[in-house]
């Protein structure tokens, strides 16, 4: 006989849970026989007591199998099914380029993404800026888009890992979000329900990351790789820098435009390109589309240079209801803020170097403009944000733009400008350049 309180007691007392304990508890989450209080109690017990590798694997499997698991064999795809997940940050627009790049190289990317909350942007919110684009298509359209364009970026349906939705909602209000075992199971349950052959994790470290500390980021990366591989999915992780915005834009429409400029070759921010290329290459090697990282990176450059990646993006947008000429006329389709004005520094800053950015505060400036959420049901202004974000190490002069702020009115612009200035530190000497990619995690780590 299953008693939820007995499972909670075992974990409270640091006794390992069996696969059956975990499966029955997750079943109870789905059929409502387990209460919110019991979910909260188990989450807190796991937060303090942790989980073994086997427990994490069992929880991931139980949550993955609580709903549909996509099976692509019926679609006769002639390549591997691959995806990437990022732990989130500011100016992190990688998904919009990586999906089409991998598709152009022969992979298939059924990317199920989320919305932003707090200082981190959400991939789905960016796509809401494209008129007509359906982030919640029916299953047939989703599968057809994956088959024809090679990539479809959509939102989570209620039929994929439904146990996670209820579990996460409880964690969110009980201070148990930061548990590495629970993060591992939550991320992988959703991603592995996509029916993947290969997965790369972009785990952010730095002051704009979900887990700012490097040790915690590394532990999370190791946990994700270990459990993913135990479940038969070729999984690797890169730990990447989030001590400043990854791209030169932060917001929704402005990040879509940044992605279009990247894919069409109009502009490729150096740090953004490094991370996009490295993550794409990981997937090409994991999916046996390339024999080595060097070969994979050449393939990435080729599909960008030839325009094949841009074509895949355009095909995806058209297939999911967006304009077929979006790539050519993105500036006409994307919403534009009423006020777009550059932020410059007074003369006393001239000659100094931008030495540090409080990236979380930079992201919160976008929230203040209306481009991000404080609560899950907040409505967004998709036109606002910032572009031309100055990178750490830049020398300030009379022409330097810290950022161009896109706001709906003058008072919002001023509030954002004040927040941005408070987030920046300057020095008389240039700072040591930071790595963008700190470490690669692969193989058996637990």
UniProtKB/Swiss-Prot annotation:
Pathway: Pyrimidine metabolism; dTMP biosynthesis via salvage pathway; dTMP from thymine: step 1/2. Gene3D superfamilies: Nucleoside phosphorylase/phosphoribosyltransferase catalytic domain, Pyrimidine nucleoside phosphorylase-like, C-terminal domain, Transferase, Pyrimidine Nucleoside Phosphorylase, Chain C. PROSITE patterns: THYMID_PHOSPHORYLASE. It catalyses: thymidine + phosphate = 2-deoxy-alpha-D-ribose 1-phosphate + thymine. Its EC number is 2.4.2.4. One of its GO terms (molecular function) is thymidine phosphorylase activity. GO terms for cellular component: cytosol. One of its GO terms (biological process) is pyrimidine nucleobase metabolic process. It holds the Pfam family PYNP_C. Belongs to the thymidine/pyrimidine-nucleoside phosphorylase family. HAMAP family: Thymid_phosp (MF_01628). NCBIfam families: PRK05820.1, T_phosphoryl, Y_phosphoryl. Homodimer. The enzymes which catalyze the reversible phosphorolysis of pyrimidine nucleosides are involved in the degradation of these compounds and in their utilization as carbon and energy sources, or in the rescue of pyrimidine bases for nucleotide synthesis. This is Thymidine phosphorylase. It comes from Idiomarina loihiensis (strain ATCC BAA-735 / DSM 15497 / L2-TR). The lineage of its organism: Bacteria, Pseudomonadati, Pseudomonadota, Gammaproteobacteria, Alteromonadales.
């Amino acid at each position: 006989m299953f008693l939820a309180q007995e499972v909670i007691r075992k974990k409270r007392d640091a006794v390992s849970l069996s696969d059956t304990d975990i499966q029955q508890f997750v079943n109870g989450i789905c059929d409502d026989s387990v209460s919110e209080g019991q979910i909260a109690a188990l989450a807190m017990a796991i937060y303090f007591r942790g989980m073994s590798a086997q427990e994490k694997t069992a929880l991931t499997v139980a949550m993955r199998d609580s709903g549909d698991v996509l099976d692509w064999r019926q679609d006769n795809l002639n390549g591997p099914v691959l995806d990437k997940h990022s732990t989130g940050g500011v100016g992190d627009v990688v998904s919009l380029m990586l999906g089409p790049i991998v598709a152009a190289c022969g992979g298939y990317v059924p990317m199920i993404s989320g919305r932003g909350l707090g200082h981190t942007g959400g991939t789905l919110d960016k796509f809401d800026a494209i008129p007509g684009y359906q982030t919640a298509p029916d299953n047939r359209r989703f599968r057809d888009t994956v088959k024809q364009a090679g990539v479809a970026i959509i939102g989570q349906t209620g039929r994929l890992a439904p146990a996670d939705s209820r579990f996460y909602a409880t964690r969110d209000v009980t201070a148990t979000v930061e548990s590495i075992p629970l993060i591992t199971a939550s991320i992988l349950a959703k991603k592995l329900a996509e029916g993947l052959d290969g997965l790369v994790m972009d785990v952010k470290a730095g002051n704009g990351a979900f887990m700012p500390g490097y040790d915690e980021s590394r532990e999370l990366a190791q946990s994700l790789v270990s459990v993913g591989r135990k479940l038969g999915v070729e999984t690797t992780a890169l730990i990447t820098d989030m001590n400043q915005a990854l791209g030169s834009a932060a917001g929704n429409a402005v990040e879509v435009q940044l992605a279009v400029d990247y894919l069409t070759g109009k502009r490729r921010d150096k740090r953004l390109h490094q991370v996009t290329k490295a993550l794409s290459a990981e997937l090409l090697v994991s999916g046996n589309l390339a024999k080595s990282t060097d070969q994979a990176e050449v393939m990435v450059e080729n599909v960008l240079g030839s325009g094949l990646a841009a074509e895949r993006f355009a095909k995806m947008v058209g297939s999911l209801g967006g304009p077929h000429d979006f790539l050519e006329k993105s500036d006409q389709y994307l919403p534009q803020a009423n006020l777009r004005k550059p932020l410059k520094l007074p003369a006393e800053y001239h000659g100094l170097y931008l030495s540090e950015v409080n990236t979380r505060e930079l992201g919160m400036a976008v929230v203040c403009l209306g481009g991000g959420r404080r609560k899950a049901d907040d409505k967004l202004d998709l036109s606002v944000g910032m572009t031309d974000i100055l990178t750490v190490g830049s020398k300030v002069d009379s022409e330097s733009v810290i950022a161009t702020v896109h706001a709906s009115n003058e008072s919002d612009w001023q509030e954002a400008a004040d927040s941005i200035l408070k987030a920046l530190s300057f020095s008389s000497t240039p700072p040591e350049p930071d790595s963008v990619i700190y470490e690669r995690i692969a193989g058996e780590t637990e």
